[in-house]
From Swiss-Prot:
Protein name: Protease HtpX
Membrane topology of the entry: Multi-pass membrane protein
Any one GO molecular function term: metalloendopeptidase activity
Organism: Wigglesworthia glossinidia brevipalpis
PANTHER family, A to Z: PROTEASE HTPX
């Protein structure tokens, strides 16, 4: 789940920064069409920036060490396993990194299939059998080969666009509703007021949280398909065994920004705010071969 939350938070931060820049510079949208265009540019802009910086953000958020020249048996095994699985998935071998954490986890990120990163926790390497670890790695390889990073970027871009557009339209309506200068209700002069600025920023945060429900729904679906992809590479019994091992371990100790791209996510008070389906549901889907290619 780490991956998606980092992605969402980065997007939200970029949108807020864009909003501050627009307010300071006094740039206004003189029409609804102009506002739609501006919302789309900044909405997708934030999403694309998040994607382009995803590897850098991921590496630094967990202090991961990229393996360029394997120095021991574990690193050699990890490097060779990911290289072999990448060939089976018809993608370029991603950069490989290890980060120090007790939890059993791994995540994949990157701007495109042939320029990706897979990071693995020391907890995974120390506590999983090779068959279980291979299943986890195949899960991350499937995320890359399925183009999940691009998919989530497009989804987030659309979500961002609606968040920006609605927050500004509603903010203008609220400001004009309480404005004493009714002659300017049809203009966008209200965009220069501090009240408009704070209301629009607050609405962006609120709508951003609500919109994350959509993002999380897509993320949960992608997890099912990544599990199925792993099962096709290493066998569903190995993937089920890996999930059962993960179920009995602690939650991932990583930044919120990367949670969605981990093999395991964090629990929430409600499933709609979870980037990963409950592990029991994932195991059941594998048993039924629900998301596997027929």
């Amino acid at each position: 789940m780490m991956r998606i939350l980092l992605f969402i938070l980065t997007n939200l931060s970029v949108m807020i920064i864009f909003g501050i820049i627009l307010f300071i510079t006094g740039i206004k949208s003189s029409s609804s069409f102009g506002l739609i265009i501006m919302s789309g540019v900044f909405g997708f802009g934030g999403s694309i920036i998040s994607l382009l910086l995803s590897k850098y953000i991921a590496i630094n958020s967990v202090n991961a060490k990229i393996i360029k020249n394997p120095k021991n048996d574990i690193e050699n095994w990890l490097f060779n396993t990911i290289k072999l699985q990448s060939q089976k998935a018809n993608i370029g071998t991603p950069d490989i990194a290890i980060y120090d954490a007790e939890d059993i986890n791994a995540f994949a990120t990157g701007p495109k299939k042939n320029s990706a990163l897979i990071a693995v926790s020391t907890g995974l390497l120390n506590n999983m059998s090779k068959k279980e670890a291979e299943a986890v790695l195949a899960h991350e390889i499937s995320h890359i080969s399925n183009g999940d990073m691009i998919t989530m970027t497009l989804i987030q871009g659309v979500v961002n666009t609606f968040v920006i557009f609605l927050s500004r339209v509603i903010s203008k309506f609220i400001v004009n509703l309480f404005s004493t200068n009714k002659e300017d209700e049809n203009s966008y002069e209200s965009e220069n007021s501090w009240s408009y600025f704070f209301i629009s920023m607050a609405l962006e945060v609120v709508f951003g949280i609500l919109a994350s429900i959509i993002t999380f729904w897509f993320s949960r679906k992608r997890e099912f398909y990544a599990d199925a992809g792993s099962a096709e590479i290493v066998g569903k019994n190995n993937m089920i065994a890996a999930l059962q091992k993960i179920k009995n371990t602690c939650e991932p100790n990583v930044g919120k920004e990367l949670l969605a791209f981990c093999i395991n996510g964090k629990k929430s008070f409600n499933e709609i705010f979870m980037s990963h389906p409950p592990i029991d549901k994932r195991i059941q889907a594998l048993i039924q071969e629900k998301y596997m290619k027929k």
